[in-house]
């Protein structure tokens, strides 16, 4: 088997951009940004938009979008004259 063909797997902190929740996990991603985690060590930081701590499916806080209003707005904007 060939050596050094697999990506390096290291500990990384993923931070939720919407609520600040942080998760320490293994990943092949890397970042120049670092953060000091709860355990006092520094790890590469990957900021993500949404995680299980902020996604409505996992939190149980459903957000309903006014689809009818959006459709009316679209039709008004692109109505054939």
UniProtKB/Swiss-Prot annotation:
GO biological process entries: translation
Gene3D superfamilies for the chain: Ribosomal protein L31 (4.10.830.30)
Protein keywords: Ribonucleoprotein, Ribosomal protein
GO CC term (a single one): ribosome
Keyword Cytoplasm on entry: no
Keyword Ribonucleoprotein: yes
Signal peptide region: none
An annotated Gene Ontology molecular function: structural constituent of ribosome
HAMAP family for the chain: Ribosomal_bL31_2
Oligomer status and interactors: Part of the 50S ribosomal subunit.
PANTHER family: 50S RIBOSOMAL PROTEIN L31, CHLOROPLASTIC, LARGE RIBOSOMAL SUBUNIT PROTEIN BL31C
The family this protein is said to belong to: Belongs to the bacterial ribosomal protein bL31 family. Type B subfamily.
Identification of the protein by name: Large ribosomal subunit protein bL31B
Organism, scientific name: Borreliella burgdorferi (strain ZS7) (Borrelia burgdorferi)
């Amino acid at each position: 088997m060939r050596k050094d063909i697999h990506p390096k797997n290291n500990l990384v902190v993923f931070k939720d951009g919407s609520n600040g929740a942080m998760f320490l996990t293994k990943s092949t991603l890397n970042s120049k940004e670092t953060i000091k985690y709860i355990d006092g060590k520094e790890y590469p930081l990957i900021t993500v938009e949404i995680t299980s701590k902020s996604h409505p499916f996992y939190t149980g806080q459903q957000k309903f979008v006014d689809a009818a209003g959006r459709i009316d707005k679209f039709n008004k904007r692109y109505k054939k004259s």
